[in-house]
Amino acid sequence: MSGGLDVLQMKEEDVLKFLAAGTHLGGTNLDFQMEQYIYKRKSDGIYIINLKRTWEKLLLAARAIVAIENPADVCVISSRNTGQRAVLKFASASGATPIAGRFTPGTFTNQIQAAFREPRLLVVTDPRADHQPITEASYVNIPTIALCNTDSPLRYVDIAIPCNNKGAHSVGLMWWMLAREVLRMRGTISREHPWEVMPDLYFYRDPEEIEKEEQAAAEKATTKEEFQGEWTAPVAEFPQAEVADWSEGVQVPSVPIQQFTAERTDVPPAPKPTEDWSTQPASTDDWSAAPTAQASEWTGTTTEWS
């Protein structure tokens, strides 16, 4: 598919990326339509994919995507977690329409649905996991491009790119390669200079691993701050004057005491001596006479009632 042009040939850097990501490693099962893309079989039963055929199909898929005038008419889909981030990155780079996550049945066939779309080209990550959009695309005559493993069914798939579509690194690298070739064929980036976007941005990362890395980085930063605060804190030095004789060094203020008493004019006078509180005055009244008289009055009233 490269047409024998040296510009479109696969470089050594691309081969090293494929090998590092494990793109050439297939599965233990083989579909009869995928036999043409197999290089050999290992002793443990894993099939090796021919990377030359992978590169040719990658260029063919990029040419099909570039042929669409409106980039938004290209729909890229990935229902599996390993390809959702790569699909979103590819859509932001090329202008395609992404569907990451669950595909709503009837998106291509049910016109009453709010999420109804009419794309001109469909690109999926896994034909087995994304069987619903591939089936609906066959109803409305939408050509389909798929990343296919050794055991992937090729029913309703027009352009199959043989690769390892199970590994997170392999899937991310394939979408990165496809985005780079699309931008190169459009003339957005040059083939003479490497693309500034790294393939790591297309790799899927487990949220738990990201959280663990953030916690480890926070703990490391905390321990580093504590270490610097303990050992590198400047010690304050206070110079002290040397005193040979302590009696000479201490100055006692010589202030007359009478000065303070003279200034205070609002001091109350001292209280006068009082009588002896233990002696009580003699009472002149006779307290026993009153109750007797009162009692006689009450008795008189009672006799009247009787």
Swiss-Prot record:
The modification N-acetylserine is found at residue 2. [DE]-W-[ST] repeats lie at residues 230-232, 245-247, 276-278, 286-288, 304-306. CDD domains: RPS2 (cd01425). GO terms for biological process: cytoplasmic translation; ribosomal small subunit assembly. InterPro entries: Ribosomal_uS2, Ribosomal_uS2_C, Ribosomal_uS2_CS, Ribosomal_uS2_euk, Ribosomal_uS2_euk/arc, Ribosomal_uS2_flav_dom_sf, Ribosomal_uS2_vert. The record marks 115-116, 133-134 as: Cleavage. Residues 247-306 are annotated as: Disordered. Residues 276-306 have a biased composition (Polar residues). SUPFAM superfamilies: Ribosomal protein S2. Residues 161-180, 205-229, 242-306 are annotated as: Laminin-binding. GO terms for cellular component: cytosolic small ribosomal subunit; nucleus; plasma membrane. The keyword NADP does not apply. The keyword Phosphoprotein does not apply. GO terms for molecular function: laminin binding; laminin receptor activity; structural constituent of ribosome. Required for the assembly and/or stability of the 40S ribosomal subunit. Required for the processing of the 20S rRNA-precursor to mature 18S rRNA in a late step of the maturation of 40S ribosomal subunits. Also functions as a cell surface receptor for laminin. Plays a role in cell adhesion to the basement membrane and in the consequent activation of signaling transduction pathways. May play a role in cell fate determination and tissue morphogenesis. PANTHER family: 40S RIBOSOMAL PROTEIN SA. This protein appears to have acquired a second function as a laminin receptor specifically in the vertebrate lineage. Monomer (37LRP) and homodimer (67LR). Component of the small ribosomal subunit. Mature ribosomes consist of a small (40S) and a large (60S) subunit. The 40S subunit contains about 33 different proteins and 1 molecule of RNA (18S). The 60S subunit contains about 49 different proteins and 3 molecules of RNA (28S, 5.8S and 5S). Interacts with rps21. Interacts with several laminins including at least lamb1. Interacts with mdk. This is Small ribosomal subunit protein uS2. It comes from Xenopus laevis (African clawed frog). The lineage of its organism: Eukaryota, Metazoa, Chordata, Craniata, Vertebrata. The gene is rpsa.
